[in-house]
Amino acid sequence: MKRLWVTGYRSYELGVFSDKDPKLTVIKYALSNYLKSLLEEGKIDWVISGANLGTEQWGLETAISLQNDYSVHTALMTPYLEFSKEWNDSNQMKYQNLTEQVDFTASTSDYPYMRPVQLKNYQNFMLEHTDRALLLYDPEHPGKTKYDYEAIKKYQEKSDYPLDIIDFYDLQEAAEEYEENHRKNFY
């Protein structure tokens, strides 16, 4: 198995509050291009992510959308039970729909949230059960993903663990490429 951990900014950190936001189109375009490249090179066959609103769910949605053309499995992992319990109905529905579409879902803890160690254990689980990572993240603009980024960097000191980053410059390039491709198709 060749497993990719996808994580990154939460939706609110990117100012994406709707599935119709044009930024989301560009983000999914960039994620899709990256995943296609790895799949075509035979570097991954699993996309594993968390359930956070934002990059994690978008990464899984993108991988699921590629399953008709590529042999890729998806897994949604959470750091504790009842992960979405405090979310509004709309976000809980998105989470529920995603759990029904992925190939595998589980929690790294057998309990609802109790203490921060559950988050650290989740992070360790993801590092030990994946072979590489993709972060939608820019170290110049830290957010909650900073903790995963730092954990991966530390893990790389003792393990061969490739880390790829889609940063804001990459997203700008993806936006320009997307616009150019759609302009060509329009005319």
Curated annotation (Swiss-Prot):
This is UPF0398 protein LJ_1195. InterPro entries: YspA. Signal peptide: none annotated. Belongs to the UPF0398 family. HAMAP family: UPF0398. PANTHER family: UPF0398 PROTEIN SPR0331, UPF0398 PROTEIN YPSA. It holds the Pfam family YpsA. It comes from Lactobacillus johnsonii (strain CNCM I-12250 / La1 / NCC 533).
